[in-house]
């Protein structure tokens, strides 16, 4: 057996039914116990994005913290991941992506609430938080907290944080603009170095500018394609729903599609895209300027909504409208490139996808640098931060030259490992989550003067 085949077997085991059920089951439990908070309070959560928490303590604004999380979350999964999910499981995979995103919003709310509640100030005066802190301070299990932090550093160094993103950037630039991989790799590495050596505030500043711009550009282009093909939209949505339960209803009666394959593809890629339950977003949420854990939890859960319900849905619908998903000669980013070119009737569509992929992947690199750094500091202290950042920058450059299949196998393994300690903590601290939520909304109800503020 080769190393790649051994790692592939480990990957299949980690991302098998137990983890998928645990992730979805945790989301379902929290959804029910919190009274469908992700639906009832989504308008309030979206409103909080643009309102400061007066007197809140933290390093960056709640909006900047969300953008840092979105920078790490919105990446190649929104373009390449959706395409691979629909090709593997049919259009029905999009339906299961919607479902896992809906449940994942409750999970994201819970983990980011805990991040603010159990955060601390480090020796440099910065806010530090995330699963490692609420596992240690909430559950009192320090070895499990250290295990999570170790997995977090591994993901940043060898997983979704670096290798898949820079590989996607360099090869997309070569395919679309004929720019050599080495040239793009050097430029990306230098840009990443300039930003991350400035620390969390520089990452947050860059993310606050890049993330909204790239998301608006990508979604606007998708909407243009949808409007140009508006007469096909009802049939496309019906196909997505029908093939979720009857894959043979898919265009062309795609051979080998099953309900289980649609579910597995949609759930796995949905979670891979929005990261709900993996424990990454809480690390960014802990830096937010806020007094209220619940308030930040509400803000953070909008990240899953924006990532999957909005951005991934746009990709999925365009793939179905144009029929690109059912072309066996296409794979990965080329599927989405083809879909957007067909949808707009010009090669400009493919260019927009490549530019979107460039920005999405670049900001994912920035966001994961911060996540890995917080985990690294938890393990060894603040003194090794500069060494960590230099190592991260060098690994970014390396990712352009590694074999693509091996990159994604390693990324899947370490990304999946992060989820287990975090989900154990969410289940173990479920009473804290429920009590904090009830307390916040009770205080909000009795404050008749300002419904956006609560009284202590």
UniProtKB/Swiss-Prot annotation:
It is a multi-pass membrane protein. The keyword Transmembrane applies. The chain crosses the membrane at residues 12-32, 63-83, 86-106, 143-163, 179-199, 208-228, 237-257, 305-325, 348-368, 390-410, 414-434. GO terms for molecular function: amino acid:sodium symporter activity. Keywords: Cell inner membrane, Cell membrane, Membrane, Symport, Transmembrane, Transmembrane helix, Transport. InterPro entries: Na/Ala_symport (IPR001463). It is found in: Cell inner membrane. One of its GO terms (cellular component) is plasma membrane. Gene3D superfamilies: Amino acid/polyamine transporter I. Belongs to the alanine or glycine:cation symporter (AGCS) (TC 2.A.25) family. This is Uncharacterized transporter HI_0883.
């Amino acid at each position: 057996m080769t190393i790649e085949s051994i790692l592939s077997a480990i990957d299949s085991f980690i991302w098998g039914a137990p983890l998928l059920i645990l992730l979805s089951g945790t989301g379902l439990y929290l959804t029910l116990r919190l009274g469908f908070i992700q639906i009832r309070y989504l308008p309030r959560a979206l409103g909080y994005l643009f309102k400061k928490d007066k007197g809140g303590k933290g390093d960056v604004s709640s909006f900047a913290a969300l953008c840092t999380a979105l920078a790490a979350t919105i990446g190649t999964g929104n373009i390449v991941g959706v395409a691979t999910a629909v090709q593997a499981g049919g259009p029905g995979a999009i339906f299961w992506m919607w479902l896992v995103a809906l449940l994942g919003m409750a999970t994201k709310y819970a983990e980011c609430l805990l991040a603010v509640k159990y955060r601390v100030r480090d020796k440099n005066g910065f806010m530090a938080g995330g699963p490692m802190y609420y596992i240690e301070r909430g559950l009192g299990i320090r070895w499990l907290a250290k295990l999570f932090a170790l997995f977090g550093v591994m993901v940043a160094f060898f997983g979704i944080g670096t290798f898949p993103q820079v590989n996607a950037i360099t090869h997309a630039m070569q395919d679309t603009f004929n720019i050599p991989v080495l040239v793009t790799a050097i430029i990306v590495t230098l840009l990443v170095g300039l930003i991350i050596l400035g620390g969390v505030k520089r990452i947050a500043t860059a993310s606050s500018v890049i993330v909204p711009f790239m998301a608006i550009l990508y979604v606007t282009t998708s909407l243009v394609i949808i409007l140009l093909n508006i007469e096909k939209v009802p049939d496309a949505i019906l196909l997505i729903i029908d093939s979720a339960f009857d894959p043979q209803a898919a265009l062309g009666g795609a051979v080998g599609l099953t309900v289980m394959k649609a579910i597995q593809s949609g759930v796995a890629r949905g979670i891979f895209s929005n990261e709900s339950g993996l424990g990454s977003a809480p690390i960014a949420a802990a830096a937010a300027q806020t007094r209220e854990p619940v308030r930040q939890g509400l803000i953070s859960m909008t990240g899953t909504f924006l990532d999957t319900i909005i951005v991934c849905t746009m990709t999925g619908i365009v793939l179905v409208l144009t029929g690109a998903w059912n072309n066996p000669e296409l794979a990965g980013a080329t599927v989405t490139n083809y879909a957007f070119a067909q949808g707009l009737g010009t090669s400009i569509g493919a260019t927009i996808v490549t530019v979107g992929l460039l920005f999405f992947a670049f900001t994912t690199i920035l966001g994961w640098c911060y996540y890995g750094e917080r985990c690294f500091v938890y393990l060894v202290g603040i003194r090794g931060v500069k060494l960590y950042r230099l190592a991260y920058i060098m690994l970014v450059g390396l990712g352009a030259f590694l074999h693509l299949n091996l990159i994604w196998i390693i990324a899947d393994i370490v990304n999946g490992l992060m989820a287990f300690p975090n989900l154990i903590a969410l289940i173990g601290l479920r009473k804290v989550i429920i009590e904090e939520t009830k307390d916040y909304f009770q205080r909000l109800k009795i404050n008749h003067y300002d419904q956006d503020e609560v009284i202590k």
